[in-house]
Swiss-Prot record:
Source species, domain of life: Bacteria
InterPro entries: G6P_Isomerase (IPR001672), G6P_Isomerase_C (IPR023096), Phosphoglucose_isomerase_CS (IPR018189), SIS_dom_sf (IPR046348), SIS_PGI_1 (IPR035476), SIS_PGI_2 (IPR035482)
Main location per the UniProt record: cytoplasm
Subcellular location: Cytoplasm
Keyword Isomerase on entry: yes
Protein name: Glucose-6-phosphate isomerase
Function: Catalyzes the reversible isomerization of glucose-6-phosphate to fructose-6-phosphate.
Family according to the record: Belongs to the GPI family.
Listed GO MF terms: carbohydrate derivative binding; glucose-6-phosphate isomerase activity; monosaccharide binding
Reactions performed catalytically: alpha-D-glucose 6-phosphate = beta-D-fructose 6-phosphate
Length: 547
């Protein structure tokens, strides 16, 4: 079967490609020089965020062509399908109703009723633990809460908990364990008191290898430190759809919180999976986080595409990936507390859109999901920004910044923000050889020195970026930011005609990992495995034969 091309999807694709070729000869600097109102025209605000997308390789014709693509992809109709609960996850025949997790007002659907009941139950638990009413097996107040989960049960809650550090109530300390590497849980429990520790086991199936093994280790640690079997229920809560498995583990049925099939793991932080967030910042702030996301849902549903933040973010990334040949994007939050955001968005984007077949199963002949990476500013300036400025690869960037800080060190926040803006400006304008030569001449350097050094000081510029601003990092603005990226991912999936809500590649990795572990346990290595895999397993078996 012949692979699907974008020309098969979009009748004006030749015009889009021709326009992309024309942009190869243009510069952003010239675009700004020609239009004093460019920044104002290419900025849009909603839900406490402002997106400045003026430093992108676009003009009015670009946007017109991209809106044509969106129209042919039926993006507006697709948005309605997502938000009303149509089965947009076609390979698993499910809706993707993460927006229902943050509904506001009175419940309107059965899903809303389930969400409200779970939130009410969560609120009672958190109040009980924070107040000291909930006690451990020695009758002491819980001081530490440990979330055991991986992927969507870890990255989102961990990121949000770190991001909202200024809002921590201080009632308990929240920790996270994800890795199957025992070093993580071993190191963590060395600093905890078993009698005052509560574990949250977050696994929809209650069978995820990493989560189950870490939970078994946590249970053994409790038992080894004097907790009786019949007291374990005071130290374990589960978020799972498999109540019977959680009860068999030793968790009281009333302490099992639901997660539903209509929520994907990487979209689930708004549910009971977000319990560690609520333990850290309290239910009021958790609900503000949900409210911020709901405001972005409303914007996504109602705003025209040309003024729609998530749609524009998706269309711009489509432009770079599918038209201008980029295969990576950088997320650079200039906020220390957002240091885990790139890792969270890495999963959100790459697990969602790392697909190579259309929704109907046809191979694609075009690039889909891009590689997402980054770190917090200004740290990245002293590591990988060199490549962004002078490397041969064009990397579209999202700069994220706050206008105000939570801390009193205003002068440091000034420098943080200044560096964010300066980086986006420098990447756009660059520095030509004549300017570099003039600077060196002013420094008294000889013509010979200038000729030798000048080429190394040239910065080509013309590197694109978005800047996303918020007044302050709060539960509301963070909720809106995350929802914007969720909907950006969906927009891209619609434009590429792929399913953004399954993850069969992850499932294959889990299966093969189990097969290799069995081979290690039995020393029965299948002869039809490749020689590399056989050799690696033999080396591990030999190294551990006496343990």
């Amino acid at each position: 079967m012949q692979a699907k091309t974008l020309a098969d999807l979009y009748s004006d694709w030749d015009k889009v490609q021709a326009h992309a070729q024309a942009w190869q000869k243009r510069t952003l600097k010239d675009a700004f020089d020609a239009d004093r109102n460019r920044a104002a025209r290419y900025s849009v605000g909603a839900a406490g965020l402002e997106l400045d997308f003026s430093k992108n390789h676009i003009d009015d014709e670009t946007l017109q062509l991209l809106m044509g693509v969106a129209d042919q992809a039926n993006l507006k109709a697709a948005i309605k399908k997502l938000l009303r609960g149509d089965h947009v996850n076609n390979t698993e025949d499910r809706p993707a109703l993460h927006s229902a997790l943050r509904f506001q007002g009175k419940p309107q659907t059965a899903e809303h009723q389930e969400v409200k009941a779970t939130l009410d139950k969560m609120a009672k638990l958190i109040k009980s633990v924070h107040s000291g009413e909930w006690k451990g097996y020695k009758g002491e107040k819980i001081t530490d809460v440990v979330n055991i989960g991986i992927g969507g049960s870890d990255l989102g809650p961990r990121m949000i908990t770190k991001a909202l550090t200024p809002f921590h109530t201080g009632d308990v300390k929240v920790h996270f364990v994800a890795n199957i590497d025992g070093a993580e849980i071993h190191d963590l429990t060395r600093g905890l008191n078993p009698s005052t520790t509560l574990f949250l086991v977050a696994s929809k199936s209650f069978s995820t290898l990493e989560t189950l093994e870490n939970s078994l280790t946590a249970r053994k640690w409790m038992l080894d430190n004097g907790c009786a079997q019949d007291q374990l229920a005071k130290h374990f809560v589960a978020i799972s759809s498999k109540v019977e498995k959680a009860v068999e583990f030793g968790i009281a049925a009333e302490n099992v919180y639901p997660i539903w099939d209509w929520v994907g793991g990487r979209y689930s932080l708004w549910s009971a999976i977000g319990m560690p967030i609520a333990f850290a910042i309290g239910m009021d702030n958790f609900n503000k986080l949900r409210a911020g996301a709901a405001a972005m849902d409303d914007h996504f549903a109602e705003a025209p595409l040309e003024r729609n933040i998530p749609a524009l973010m998706g269309l711009l990334m489509f432009w770079y990936s599918s038209c201008l040949g980029t295969d990576t994007q950088a997320i650079l939050p200039y906020a220390y507390h957002l240091q885990l955001l790139p890792a969270y968005l890495q999963q959100l984007e790459m697990e969602s859109n790392g697909k190579s077949v259309t929704k109907s199963g046809e191979r694609v002949d075009y690039q889909t999901g891009s590689i997402v990476w980054g770190t917090e500013g200004t740290n990245g300036q002293h590591s990988f920004h060199q490549l962004l400025h002078q490397g041969t690869t064009m990397v579209p960037i999202d700069f994220i910044a706050t206008l105000q800080a939570h801390h009193p060190l205003d002068h440091q926040h000034k420098f943080l923000f200044a560096n964010c803006v300066a980086q986006s400006q420098a990447l756009m304008t660059g520095r030509d050889q004549a300017t570099s030569e003039a600077e060196m001449r002013a420094q008294g350097m000889s013509d010979e020195q200038i000729a030798e050094l000048a080429p190394h000081k040239v910065h080509p510029g013309n590197r694109p970026s978005n800047t996303i601003l918020m007044d302050k990092l709060t539960p509301e603005t963070l909720g809106a930011l995350i929802a914007a990226y969720e909907h950006k991912v969906y927009t891209l999936g619609v434009l590429w005609n792929i399913n953004s809500f399954d993850q069969w590649g992850v499932e294959l990795g889990k299966l093969l990992g189990t097969h290799v572990a069995t081979a290690i346990d039995t020393t029965d290595i299948p002869s039809d495995w490749d020689s590399s895999t056989q050799t690696l397993v033999k080396k591990f078996t030999e190294a551990n034969k006496n343990l």
